[in-house]
Amino acid sequence: YNDDDVFRYERPDELTDPRSGVICIPNNYRYPNGEQMPEGQLRVTCLANYEKWGALDENTYRSQKEICRKAMLDVALGYLPNGKSMAKELEERTELLDIFSPRTIKKFTSHLDGALYGSPRKSRDGSTQFSNLYLAGSDQGYVGIVGAMLGGVAVANNRILRGD
């Protein structure tokens, strides 16, 4: 989603920029025989500033995560059918919150500047140090889910169609 006149894919000046992001409902599928997942999931991701998050003391960090969560959810719910009108019910029925920042990602994955996707070293052609092993996805430097798909297409085109 993008809630601004222009999409700015850049590091925000603030901790986060909730004006644009990705909404993911990962278990929103039709299952066989009418089965359903016992709970729903909603993920919202937006651009964030690693340096700003990294500079916060622990108490401020925790309070800012909650402030940013509320701001992100407020914008994202506006893009879902009846989202704004269901905000209170969603809050009441929430069983688990997992809020993370670039600081969290850096701590657990060592990704450069807490980046969410891909390897810190991009390989445009997908090559690795092993013959016949190629990375295809966000490791080509494209962004997000569509970027991962484009990365796969680019590597497949280079390796299979062109025979590089």
Predicted regions and their residues:
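Active-site lining segments that contact anionic ligands and/or coordinate catalytic metals
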Residues: P18-S20, E39-Q41, F130-S131
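Flavin-binding catalytic cores
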Residues: T16, Q36, T60-F100
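Short glycine/proline-enriched loop/turn "hinge" motifs that connect secondary-structure elements
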Residues: Y31-E39, R124-Q129
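Glycine-rich, aromatic-lined ligand/substrate-binding cores of catalytic
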Residues: G34-K70
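Mid-domain catalytic core of redox enzymes
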Residues: Y1-E35
